[in-house]
Amino acid sequence: LSELDKVLGSELLSYATQPVTLLGSSIGTWRHACLSQPHPAAAIQRLQKAYLYQEYASTRPTPQEVSQVAEVMLQEALGQDGVKDLLQQNRFRNAIITARAKGITRGKSGLPLLAGMTTAMALNILSRRSLGLLFDRVAFCHAELEEVPFTQGFNTQRVALNEENLIPALKASGAI
């Protein structure tokens, strides 16, 4: 998808005459963060390189190591001023969607995690809206984005993006 993102960032989205909302979760939000940079194709290229060449100290990395490597990838992709650039530009209004576990879904590993995710799967089959019993939706949003799209029927907490929460929000969106 990196080649498509380069075309989107350098060609198609550069013609936008009004602000564009970039709403997503997981790796999509990482790509949106790159598209929001002054030189989006270069940021996408850095993300691709960081992703392809990520390294771990062991063959079975701990969750902490995975989190640390993900943070390094994001910092490499965005560059030295990328966080400030994303927050200060007004062309793209990022909305980073995350889910905060509650109740039985708060298990971190093993049987508690399996029980929580199995419960979530069963509730999702019955009704997607019932997932609100197990998760809170948190949308980390650009300061200029007043309303988060596609949240009807879901309890969504809006949090303004800032320099301290951008990287953690991107990681949380990917469940890292």
Predicted regions and their residues:
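Patatin-like phospholipase
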Residues: L1-T21, C34-I176
